[in-house]
């Protein structure tokens, strides 16, 4: 399928997707009932969309195009009420978090969807293992060239986005020692990590043509890059965050990305070059492994900086942009999080260290989601 022309969208508009866990009490393992929930709510959603993701234990909540985080929060809140009621009616519960702490990937059923079934044929068991849960944020762009500039600019802050959203320390019943273990699941995919270097939209079109020769790529949705352009929507999509435990944190993360995008496209503070990516995977690993306690390295100077310190510097830089687009509350909340040194991964570990079980942890996450 050829790459569509880049759809011009209003700059800095938002679209947010949350991949949620559908669980079965009282054992709190993943359920295989997302199709039933989607059927139950499809005529009750007035804004946004509730839809399938890869496997039957995943439920995606997606906003419409939103002007700001307040509009997105309102849509999510309304969807949440409908979904929670449907889950209660079917004796199910819903929660966030980047991974389910003890599910077995072998039990996961891929959705009866042509695209997902084709992906299963291409990638085999890797698709079942990809039963993990992330937050994706789309930001509108006026042109394809703007999208490429924005993608490279946001890529500098992938470690910051991962560390602030880290919520997947447990997997397959084990403490992984990672703050965010979810991104590791995609390491075997041939398109894992950053997009190959291009400097403008024309070069991206050539890159996509080359990738399509593999016969594994039918559309941009078949590419699993950390950040990717979405020409159909006219956006850049950031895909590195774990699904937070609360709607409020999800909205704050979206506000961070929207404000960073505004700063990048308004100020144009960087002259991007391929060398920017030399240490990309090392810095990304630091964020996944250690969260905000990680250390990132500048590929041009060799300077090493604590991720906490660099995140505070980013929040300070983008504060004026956040004010202009109505995202100041998000930046202030994230600033408090960084200063406190807490993230959701550490709170999960604290719960278990205090004697809680992994079953109890999922139950608590369901209570947090329902009470947010």
Curated annotation (Swiss-Prot):
<keyword id="KW-0547">Nucleotide-binding</keyword>
<comment type="subunit">
    <text>Homodimer.</text>
</comment>
<dbReference type="GO" id="GO:0004357">
    <property type="term" value="F:glutamate-cysteine ligase activity"/>
</dbReference>
<dbReference type="GO" id="GO:0016879">
    <property type="term" value="F:ligase activity, forming carbon-nitrogen bonds"/>
</dbReference>
<dbReference type="InterPro" id="IPR006336">
    <property type="entry name" value="GCS2"/>
</dbReference>
<dbReference type="GO" id="GO:0042803">
    <property type="term" value="F:protein homodimerization activity"/>
</dbReference>
<comment type="function">
    <text>ATP-dependent carboxylate-amine ligase which exhibits weak glutamate--cysteine ligase activity. However, because of the low catalytic rate, the question remains whether L-cysteine is the actual biological substrate.</text>
</comment>
<dbReference type="InterPro" id="IPR011793">
    <property type="entry name" value="YbdK"/>
</dbReference>
<comment type="similarity">
    <text>Belongs to the glutamate--cysteine ligase type 2 family. YbdK subfamily.</text>
</comment>
<dbReference type="GO" id="GO:0005524">
    <property type="term" value="F:ATP binding"/>
</dbReference>
<dbReference type="InterPro" id="IPR050141">
    <property type="entry name" value="GCL_type2/YbdK_subfam"/>
</dbReference>
<dbReference type="GO" id="GO:0042398">
    <property type="term" value="P:modified amino acid biosynthetic process"/>
</dbReference>
<keyword id="KW-0067">ATP-binding</keyword>
<dbReference type="Pfam" id="PF04107">
    <property type="entry name" value="GCS2"/>
</dbReference>
<protein>
    <recommendedName>
        <fullName>Putative glutamate--cysteine ligase 2</fullName>
        <ecNumber>6.3.2.2</ecNumber>
    </recommendedName>
</protein>
<keyword id="KW-0436">Ligase</keyword>
<dbReference type="InterPro" id="IPR014746">
    <property type="entry name" value="Gln_synth/guanido_kin_cat_dom"/>
</dbReference>
């Amino acid at each position: 399928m050829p790459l569509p022309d880049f759809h011009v969208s209003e700059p800095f508009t938002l679209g947010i997707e949350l991949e949620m866990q559908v669980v079965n009490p009282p054992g709190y393992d993943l359920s295989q009932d997302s199709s039933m929930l989607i059927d139950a709510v499809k005529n009750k959603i007035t804004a946004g969309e509730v839809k399938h993701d890869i496997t039957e234990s995943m439920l995606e909540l997606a906003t419409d195009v939103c002007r700001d985080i307040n509009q997105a929060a309102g849509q999510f809140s309304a969807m949440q009420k409908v979904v929670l009621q449907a889950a209660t009616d079917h004796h199910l519960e819903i929660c966030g978090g980047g991974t389910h702490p003890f599910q077995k990937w072998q039990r996961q059923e891929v959705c009866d969807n042509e695209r997902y079934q084709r992906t299963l044929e291409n990638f085999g068991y890797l698709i079942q293992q990809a039963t993990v849960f992330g937050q994706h944020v789309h930001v509108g762009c006026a042109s394809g060239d703007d999208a490429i500039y924005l993608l490279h600019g946001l890529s500098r802050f992938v470690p910051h986005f991962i560390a602030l959203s880290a919520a997947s320390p447990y997997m397959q019943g084990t403490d992984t020692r990672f703050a965010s273990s979810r991104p590791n699941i995609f390491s075997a995919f041939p398109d894992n990590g950053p997009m190959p270097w291009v400097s403008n939209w024309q070069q991206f079109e050539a890159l996509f043509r080359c990738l399509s020769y593999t016969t594994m790529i039918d559309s941009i949705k078949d590419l699993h890059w950390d950040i990717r352009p979405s020409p159909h929507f006219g956006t850049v999509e950031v895909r590195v965050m774990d699904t937070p435990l609360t709607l409020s944190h999800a909205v704050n993360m979206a506000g961070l990305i929207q404000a960073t995008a505004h700063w990048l496209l308004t100020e144009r503070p960087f002259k991007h070059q391929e060398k920017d990516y030399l240490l990309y995977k090392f810095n990304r690993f630091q964020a996944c492994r250690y969260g905000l306690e990680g250390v990132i390295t500048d590929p041009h100077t060799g300077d090493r900086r604590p991720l906490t310190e660099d995140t505070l510097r980013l929040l300070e830089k983008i504060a004026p942009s956040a004010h202009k687009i109505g995202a100041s509350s998000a930046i202030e909340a994230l600033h408090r999080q960084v200063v406190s040194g807490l993230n959701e991964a550490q709170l999960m570990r604290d719960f278990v260290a205090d004697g809680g079980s992994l079953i109890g942890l999922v139950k608590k996450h369901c209570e947090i989601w329902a009470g947010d």
